[in-house]
């Protein structure tokens, strides 16, 4: 088995039931093409594509269009490299886990060949999964982001592996799109033992550092609301050897523009001010 050298880290895709599907089709095609370009520099076994939660938008209210669209997108990605998916708060009803969630339904019916739903593999609990030279340390939303109890044990038995935290939630001190700095969420100490954390949930791209561990949010793949910036939507690409990363933007012909004016005359005089670039 070849070592993993590259991880393409996506999050917060939010595929709708039927809304904006033309836009999503164009943008996700660009994403797949960019993933192919990045992965072409490696052997297929050396690349992983991670979706760090919120593949879909409407929790358990799903449509035929969504199931076809989401499964087609994942099939395209799994042709590029092995895909790892974790659940986010829009992929299930957190308060009613007795209901079958959308990710479980999708993976139970789609018969993916190279796409893995990590929460299901770990029996919907936090835990560690060894993947060649990487250990995926899942802080599962199904278990309220409990810290995996086996991190130290697995790290001791796999001393050369990269311990990568997977988390879809908020960290104390993270920043929302409106500029609010959160005082709720997981404390950074929860990620002790991880070499990095590949996170989702916050649509504002940002990097936090807690101790020696960087927590990276690539931001939403596609602009979701007027409250988000028009720019800086895409994903992160990781070099596993040194745990460095870079952000990749996906250009869009679509946008939700928040414009400020002092009076209607500003429109006539082209003096509108774009405030969410």
Name every feature range the model reports, one short phrase each.
Residues 13, 89, 121-123, 142, ...:
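Short, solvent-exposed coil/turn elements at secondary-structure transition points
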Residues 3, 21, 60-216:
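His/Asp/Glu-rich metal-coordinating catalytic cores
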Residues 129-130, 216-277:
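Binuclear metal-dependent phosphoesterase catalytic core
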Residues 1-73, 79, 150, 156-159:
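N-terminal active-site segment of His-dependent metallophosphoesterases
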Residues 8, 135-137, 236, 255:
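Conserved beta-strand elements of the Class I
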Residues 15, 57, 171, 204, ...:
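Short, glycine/acidic-enriched loop or turn micro-motifs at the edges of active sites
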Residues 12, 54, 88, 168, ...:
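Cofactor-binding loop segments of dinucleotide-utilizing enzymes, especially the Rossmann-like FAD-
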Residues 16, 58, 92, 145, ...:
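Flexible, glycine-rich phosphate/dinucleotide-binding loops
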């Amino acid at each position: 088995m070849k070592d993993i050298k590259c991880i393409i880290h996506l999050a917060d895709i939010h595929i709708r039931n039927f809304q904006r599907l033309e836009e999503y089709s164009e943008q996700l095609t660009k994403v797949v093409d960019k993933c192919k370009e990045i992965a072409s520099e490696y052997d297929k076994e050396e690349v992983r594509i991670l979706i760090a939660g919120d593949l879909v938008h409407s929790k358990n209210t799903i449509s035929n269009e969504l199931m076809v669209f989401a499964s087609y997108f994942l099939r395209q990605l799994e042709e590029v490299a092995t895909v790892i998916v974790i659940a986010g708060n829009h992929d299930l009803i957190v308060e009613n886990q007795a209901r079958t969630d959308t990710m479980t339904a999708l993976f139970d019916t789609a018969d993916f060949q190279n796409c893995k739903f990590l929460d299901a593999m770990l029996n919907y609990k936090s835990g560690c999964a060894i993947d060649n030279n990487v250990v995926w340390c899942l802080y599962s939303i199904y278990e309220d982001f409990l810290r995996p109890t086996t991190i130290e044990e697995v790290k001791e038995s796999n001393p050369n592996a990269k311990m990568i935290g997977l988390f879809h939630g908020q960290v104390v001190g993270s920043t929302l799109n409106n500029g609010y700095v959160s005082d709720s969420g997981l404390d950074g100490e929860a990620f002790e033992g991880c070499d990095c954390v590949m996170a989702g949930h916050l649509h504002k791209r940002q990097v936090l550092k807690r101790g020696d561990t960087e927590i990276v949010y690539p931001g939403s793949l596609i602009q979701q609301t007027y409250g988000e910036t028009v720019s800086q939507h895409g994903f992160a690409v990781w070099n596993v050897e040194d745990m460095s990363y870079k952000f990749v933007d996906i250009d869009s012909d679509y946008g939700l523009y928040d414009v400020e004016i002092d009076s209607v005359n500003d429109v006539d005089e082209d003096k509108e001010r774009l405030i969410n670039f």
